[in-house]
From Swiss-Prot:
Region (Disordered): 1-21, 155-183
Family per similarity comment: Belongs to the SNF2/RAD54 helicase family.
Helicase ATP-binding domain span: 299-487
Any single GO CC term annotated in Swiss-Prot or TrEMBL for this entry: nucleus
Binding site for ATP: 346-353
Name of the protein described by the UniProt record: DNA repair and recombination protein RDH54
Keyword Hydrolase: yes
Length: 924
């Protein structure tokens, strides 16, 4: 036996599948005929001794590759069936559909036939249907329309025509006799012996300039690429198209799934926020009444801006606008070449991959529900940390959120929890693309650990949501603005020198007649407004009037009981006040005590200030036995009237849990079913309490702590709200009152504010009516502010003294300040005053000439009169459209509940301001 000689040759690589297919096929002699070889045909029966691969079969496979113009072509995505929660596609391909057929044929990218499936009965769901093709799941992605696209698809599919799948390689191949064995296939003899080399598939993306996938810029064959937006603007009714800069490659269009629900002010808000986060300069809009949201403007870049402050009033839909922006940035980007794209040139990922939402713990559930309501949680992954988690579990969840790309896109976390996971966030801060802070005014303290933690994350794109970001402190204003857009106002030292000092001096009552200081303060105020309006958006809830049911506002002045008057006198005498050294801070405890007396004298004994400064055992015992008050009597009469006269529910709001305790006891005694929410209720129980109240018709009342009611609670199950006492901060009361008059409310709303006549309650109300001036000034509410005046600090020590005075001989001290009408229910029209001109004249006279002591005293008296007139003017502006009603002269209060209860309340209500809703006016 001859043994082959061993030769040390290099390893010969295996033959590539598909090349030289038939070089091993050797026909027998009987296969040769006298006919020309090019025309001869043989019948070959291939047998495989080892391979289990498919036999050669040239029977025509289903395809729709004819040149018929009625054939439609689609791009597809396919995958193997899987039970994974988060499924991905394994490949792309094509589908064809003939006009004369109702069957789709599917092919992979190499032109290999995958299978076919019948069309769905609903043609509208063609692109939503998951087809079954062989062992694959297939979904249509995009229909090819352009001629170049169709040619590319035909060319790709035609590569596999006539070239059946090559047989798998076997160790032995035999070719038996050429007799026709069942007609398995026939081929020309010339093809049998020719060396057929399968052409390498040429990618579709290299055959056309349209709908190309992205390739590296270093590619030798790179050509001009064209990209397309995720949504076709021509197929969307009233689309929202974002603005862009000159470098943008595609338009960013808000998903119509959300866009169709947005109101005009919300459309503008989403576009404004997008511009800020993208660093675009504000566009110049000649006519603000024209809707510009359907057009994309090419704007300049503004390198100072990368964040936004949305300071809209409560109820304008800040959460929905934020979700719309988040969804837009997750799904879309104007820079398509920087992300992976589909075969059609459509970006597959957005500008942001991971977004951090930080909010009060009570709002975490509300945020997640809103995501589910508007988007469905199957579209977007939202992670919240369970309150039952251990710290280690929270840290692990945060790590997984940041490192696992496809599962979750949004993390919602409470401000307090943020501190416990700050280390994990810090390690992976480069993965966080956007930060959203709800109730952003909580970040106004520059020394806050939460604020410093958020600063350390160094997230470029930031969105802050708040109803009232500034009241009267420019230091806090700087802290918030510098966090949103660091450095835009310079350092704090320069900001203080340029803005705080001149503006504060201009607002100081001691400089009210210094023309130079006032002009400089006004100039600096305008300069700051120009800087901040580029990224601050503020709208009032007056926008909602045409969308929500009418609202009637009623301010009721309640006569104090004699026991309350005695309590006021005893406390003020026992306090031994030194008005020369008195400041607001030093008198805060006394102010709180007097507010409690307005609610009920029974609250006096447990007050810390009373125990430490005044304590009188005999008086304390008499107060504890006197739980009733003028406001409590009016409250219980109103509740009884609402329960008997209507089928509506009511919310009762107070700033003190002790007051809620008294009200709760009175409601229990009256048999009024109710639920309660205050600071002692765990966060995880609050959602269920609110849901139960809104849905259960058997629950009549809802007792709410004002501090708990200012964080997004939706109590639309009630249509009447009673604000039992007032807070110094008007935003607290406004937020609490907005709990019922918001989206989802179907009934006309009635808001009652109870004020004790002639006492500190009225002073707080007057303060509220004027305190918004600074907030309005820097946030753009120009309708109510006096543009020519920068003297916003209208309370001095004389005002502080007046806080502790009790007016027992008035029906309403507030009405006495602004009006002298008879209270017959008429809406008072106030003429324009020349108060500003008088003030300017006083300034000039006091600063330009020498003044004697007598003249100085005269000018000081004039100044005091001028200040009183100015206070009256500010209060009057806030009470425009209110009707003035004296119950002794007029018993119609534009509310059937109070009108019907007037017989019982005539001695308890001394005066009323009523701003009726539209329905009330029509009924009159």
């Amino acid at each position: 036996m001859q043994i082959p000689k061993y030769e040390n040759k290099p390893f010969k690589p295996p033959r590539r599948v598909g090349s030289n297919k038939y070089t091993q096929l050797k026909p027998t002699a009987t296969a040769v005929t006298t006919a020309p070889i090019s025309k001869a045909k043989v019948t070959v029966n291939l047998k495989r001794s080892i391979s289990a691969g498919p036999t050669l079969n040239l029977a025509k496979k289903p395809n729709n590759l004819s040149s018929n113009e009625n054939t439609r072509y689609f791009t597809i995505m396919y995958r193997k069936p899987t039970t994974k929660k988060h499924k991905t596609w394994s490949g792309d391909g094509y589908a064809t559909l003939k006009a004369s057929s109702d069957k789709l044929c599917f092919y992979n990218e190499a032109g290999k036939f995958l299978g076919s499936s019948m069309l769905p009965s609903d043609s509208d769901s063609l692109f939503e249907t998951l087809f079954k093709a062989g062992s694959n799941e297939v979904q249509l992605d995009y229909e090819l329309k352009e001629n170049a696209e169709i040619r590319s698809a035909k060319e790709a599919l035609s590569q596999n025509m006539g070239n059946p799948n090559p047989p798998t390689t076997s160790t032995t191949e035999t070719v038996p006799s050429t007799k026709n064995d069942g007609g398995k296939y026939q081929m020309p003899l010339s093809q049998l012996f020719s060396l057929n080399t399968v052409k390498r598939f040429k990618s579709v993306t290299k055959q056309t300039n349209e709908h190309m996938t992205t390739v590296p810029k270093t590619s030798q064959n790179s050509k001009a690429k064209k990209y397309y937006p995720v949504f076709d603007v021509n197929k969307i009714d009233n689309p929202i198209v974002m603005n862009k800069n000159a470098a943008a490659e595609v338009d960013v269009i808000v998903d119509p799934l959300l866009g169709k629900f947005l109101r005009p002010h919300q459309r503008e808000g989403v576009k404004f926020m997008y511009d800020c986060l993208m660093g675009l300069a504000r566009p110049t809009i000649e006519n603000p009444d024209i809707d510009c949201t359907t057009k994309s403007l090419v704007l300049e870049n503004d390198s100072d801006i990368s964040g936004c402050l949305l300071a809209d009033d409560m109820g304008l839909g800040k959460t929905l606008m934020s979700i719309t922006l988040i969804w837009t940035l997750i799904r879309q980007t104007p820079f398509a070449s920087k992300v992976s794209c589909s075969q059609s040139g459509i970006p597959l990922t957005g500008l942001c991959k991971k977004i951090l939402v930080v909010c009060p713990v009570t709002l975490i559930g509300n945020w997640k529900r809103e995501f589910g309501k508007w988007l469905n949680l199957s579209r977007i992954g939202v992670l919240t940390l369970s309150s039952r988690n251990s710290p280690d579990m929270d840290k692990m969840a945060v790590r997984n959120f940041l490192k696992v790309q496809r599962t979750y896109q949004v993390l919602i976390i409470g401000y307090e929890k943020l501190l416990s996971v700050s280390e994990e966030l810090e390690k992976n801060k480069h993965l966080i693309d956007m930060l959203v802070c709800d109730e952003g005014h909580r970040l106004k303290n520059g020394a806050s650990k939460i604020l410093n933690t958020l600063k350390s994350l160094d997230i470029r794109r930031k969105l802050l949501l708040t109803g009232t970001p500034i009241q009267n402190d420019l230091n806090e204003f700087f802290t918030i603005i510098d966090f949103i857009n660091p450095g835009i106002l310079g350092s704090f030292a320069s900001f203080k020198r340029r803005f705080i000092i001149p503006i504060t001096r201009a607002r100081d009552t001691a400089n009210r007649y210094n023309e130079e200081l006032l002009e400089k303060g006004e100039e600096r105020s305008k300069e700051m407004i120009e800087i901040t309006k580029r990224f601050i958006l503020r709208r009032t809830n007056a926008i909602l009037e045409k969308y929500l049911p009418p609202k009637t506002d009623i301010i009721l002045f309640c006569k104090p009981y004699s026991q309350q008057i005695l309590a006021f006198k005893d406390i003020l005498q026992g306090a031994r006040l030194d008005f020369g050294q008195l400041t607001f801070s030093s008198s805060l405890g006394l102010i709180t005590l007097l507010k409690k007396v307005c609610n009920s004298p029974g609250l006096v004994g447990s007050d810390p200030y009373y125990k430490s400064h005044i304590k009188d055992t005999q008086s304390q015992d008499s107060y504890s036995r006197s739980l009733n008050s003028g406001k409590l009597r009016v409250l219980m009469t109103l509740l009884e009237g609402i329960r008997k006269g209507t089928k509506e529910k009511v919310v009762v709001v107070s700033n003190y849990t002790q007051t809620l305790d008294i009200i709760e006891n009175l409601m229990n005694m009256a048999g009024m079913s109710h639920c309660r929410l205050d600071g002692s209720i765990p966060a995880k129980q609050r959602d269920s309490i609110v849901t139960s109240f809104n849905r259960n018709p058997a629950i009549f009342g809802f007792l709410l702590s004002a501090k708990s009611g200012g964080v997004g609670l939706n109590l639309v199950g009630a249509s009447r709200l009673i604000l039992f006492d007032n807070d110094w901060n008007p935003s607290v009361d406004l937020q609490a009152m907005s709990r019922i008059h918001r989206d989802g409310q179907k009934k006309p709303c009635f808001i009652y504010r109870l004020v004790t006549t002639g006492c500190i309650d009225e002073k707080i109300l007057q303060r509220q009516l004027m305190k918004n001036s600074l907030s309005q000034k820097f946030l753009g509410d120009s309708e109510m502010r006096n543009k020519e005046s920068s003297n916003d600090d209208l309370f001095n020590k004389e005002d502080l003294k007046d806080l502790f005075s009790v007016h027992t001989d008035t029906k309403s001290n507030t009405h006495d300040l602004i009006c002298s009408c008879d209270g017959l229910g008429e809406e008072i029209e106030y003429p324009e005053t020349n108060q500003q001109q008088n003030t300017v004249e006083l300034r000039k006279r006091s600063t330009t000439t020498w003044t004697s002591a007598l003249d100085l005293q005269k000018k000081m008296n004039e100044a005091a009169t001028n200040d009183d007139a100015k206070k009256s003017q500010y209060i009057r502006q806030c009470l425009v459209h209110y009707k003035h009603i004296d119950p002794a002269r007029q018993d119609e209060l534009f509310d059937e509940v109070i009108t019907d209860s007037f017989t019982d309340l005539k001695d308890s209500i001394t005066f009323a301001f009523v701003k009726p809703g539209e329905i009330c006016l029509r009924e009159q």
